[in-house]
Amino acid sequence: MPVRQLPEQVVNRIAAGEVVERPASVVKELVENAIDAGASRIDVFTDGGGRRRIGITDDGSGMTAKDLALAVERHATSKLDDEDLLQIRTLGFRGEALPSIGSVARLSITTRHAGEPHAWALTVEGGEKSEIMPAALAHGTRVEVNDLFYATPARLKFLKTDRTEAEAIREVVRRLAMARPDVAFTLAGEERAPVTWAAALPGAAGRLTRLGDILGAEFRSHAIEVHAEREGIVVSGYAAAPALTKANALGQYLFVNGRPVRDKLILGAVRAAYSDYLPRDRHPVLALFVTLDPREVDANVHPAKTEVRFRNAGLVRALIVHGLKEALAREGRRTAANSGESALSSFRPAFTPRPASWDWRASPSAPVAPMPSFDGAAAPAFTERAQAAFDVGAPSADVRFETQPVSDLVDRPLGAARTQIHETYIVSQTRDGLIIVDQHAAHERIVYEGLKASLAANGVQRQILLIPEIVEMDEATVERLLERSDELASFGLAIESFGPGAVAVRETPSLLGKTNAGGLLRDLSEHMAEWDEALPLERRLMHVAATMACHGSVRAGRRLRPEEMNALLREMEETPNSGQCNHGRPTYVELKLSDVEKLFGRR
């Protein structure tokens, strides 16, 4: 068959296959056009999941009759000149959207430029263009798309249900609304009540308002501002505290120069930043905005413009990781406050008041043991003086501690320890409320941060076992551990082969105190079996540290003396990220006295 030039309609339908994947693709292209036209208000209406009808109305600059005629021609655009492809500043730039849509649907455009006496209208059906006619429209542009894919019915078979397609449209509009909080959006149709997002004030406060309107009040209450800047690249936005997570990455909204993207490099940076805060099966919720010189990023690498390529990808990744880690460390205490508010909402009265006629005479009951009395002993350096008291598995040692009056300790951020309940939770008193601490989770974070700091400094201090501990395991597990023995040694865990199916543990990290070496090695081996061979060394080391921290922490069920509890509180105050354990759960919750008084009707 000889080579021949394809008809224009066929060319447009081929292009439509890349640009117009589903109704949501149409909405994305048309809303981006409205934003590029300088609109301050955009209204979106859909019916039948966008199959039957899509309507977009904006108050942007509009088009003249001449521009309208060119707008439905392929690769005709006002957003690009000969030299601009390497510095794209608009959301659209190829000039493909309108002709592609018109080739597979019934397209109607009505537009009015500010300098025109009236509006102009044009229709395109299956690639066939009508004459441009005068029309009525106050200002801006109205685009209607009816019977999507009627000209290519085979494409209809690949669409989902109306409800699924409508949800995809909703997600597209949500992302574009996040990118432009200065623009008002309305989304209507699909037998739903219209959703309106009013234009927000400029600046960070306006952005948070828009994000809260879209992502909900829970995100707003957990939101932490992110800002980092280096060499002309700015990373800004809001990330939720680790207490708010999802089972997938759908809650991560990423933008580059105002363009919604799904970029693997940025997603990888987000995972790295949260690696110390979340378990591997949980994902953070955030909206990050990367702003940089358009010449430093290529937006023309994907048909749907959802991917970008950075000239200096390493710097962008490092800046995102730095900005997120700094924000999370700075706002670590807010997790506790938010968790306390959530806990308060579930409180209910534990009894029903008796009628006045009931007999209120006391009934026999078992005597209640008196609460322990103490003056609030505190250890100024938990990891040094108090370590003996926290040796895992050891009884409470006779350790001497310096003491401070309770009245002094209540002014500390985590207050003065008052009691321990269920041998698991420490209750402390602050000047304006109380704090409940999960002793294992808190100590786990302290040990983890201590291991990291030691590794970054002069190495982890180790303790030599007088009698090496022999741990028997299957040969595959032993081999896996011995292959990583150098990495384990960097954390003070020295092992060597002890014949088939066994290893000898000769040294353990001092921070762990007395630990179950066998259990630690088995857990380490299980985690190593899940590692990807391409996992960077730093990430592998952090996984080792996290596992060691879990084993080296005071356990739930361990009774603590007052001085031990205060020692833990003081060390938490000095430890970075102490508001969450290594798995992302809060280490403590804070209840204000005013909130407690509300529970008892005092306020």
From Swiss-Prot:
The keyword Zinc does not apply. GO terms for biological process: mismatch repair. One of its GO terms (cellular component) is mismatch repair complex. This protein is involved in the repair of mismatches in DNA. It is required for dam-dependent methyl-directed DNA mismatch repair. May act as a 'molecular matchmaker', a protein that promotes the formation of a stable complex between two or more DNA-binding proteins in an ATP-dependent manner without itself being part of a final effector complex. This is DNA mismatch repair protein MutL. One of its GO terms (molecular function) is ATP-dependent DNA damage sensor activity. NCBIfam families: mutl, PRK00095.2-4. It comes from Bradyrhizobium diazoefficiens (strain JCM 10833 / BCRC 13528 / IAM 13628 / NBRC 14792 / USDA 110). HAMAP family: DNA_mis_repair. Keywords: DNA damage, DNA repair. Gene3D superfamilies: 3.30.230.10, Histidine kinase-like ATPase, C-terminal domain, MutL, C-terminal domain, dimerisation subdomain, MutL, C-terminal domain, regulatory subdomain. The gene is mutL. The lineage of its organism: Bacteria, Pseudomonadati, Pseudomonadota, Alphaproteobacteria, Hyphomicrobiales. Belongs to the DNA mismatch repair MutL/HexB family.
